[in-house]
């Protein structure tokens, strides 16, 4: 069984289903949320801290916005700031248990 902190309350707000698994679950696990702004939905993710931000973005887009054609047109934000190096491990960001990663289109578009 993996070491894990208790699931933060914020992680279960407005999410659906069981948490998605990201990376190896053999060590410590971060309980995160990923929200795709254009999908207006969020998922819970139990992530290995060594998984990359790019892997998290790919998983969230696949689950919440499967019709996306160009993942590189989406940015990942944490605490309001864009994460510029998506190849960095999640542990290298300011993410803690309960953090929410916001994934949104790089360019603002009018509401249809």
Question: Language-model segments: what does each one mean?
Answer:
Residues 2-112:
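Ubiquitin system architectures
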């Amino acid at each position: 069984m993996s070491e894990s902190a208790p699931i933060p309350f914020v992680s279960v707000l407005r999410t659906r289903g069981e948490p998605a698994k990201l990376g190896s679950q053999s060590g410590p696990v971060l309980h995160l949320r990923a929200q795709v702004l254009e999908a207006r939905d969020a998922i819970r993710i139990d992530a290995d801290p060594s998984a990359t931000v790019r892997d998290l973005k790919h998983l969230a887009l696949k689950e919440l916005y499967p019709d996306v054609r160009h993942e590189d047109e989406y940015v990942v934000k944490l605490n309001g700031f864009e994460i510029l190096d998506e190849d960095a491990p999640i542990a290298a960001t300011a993410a803690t248990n309960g953090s929410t990663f916001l994934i949104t289109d790089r360019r603002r578009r009018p509401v249809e």
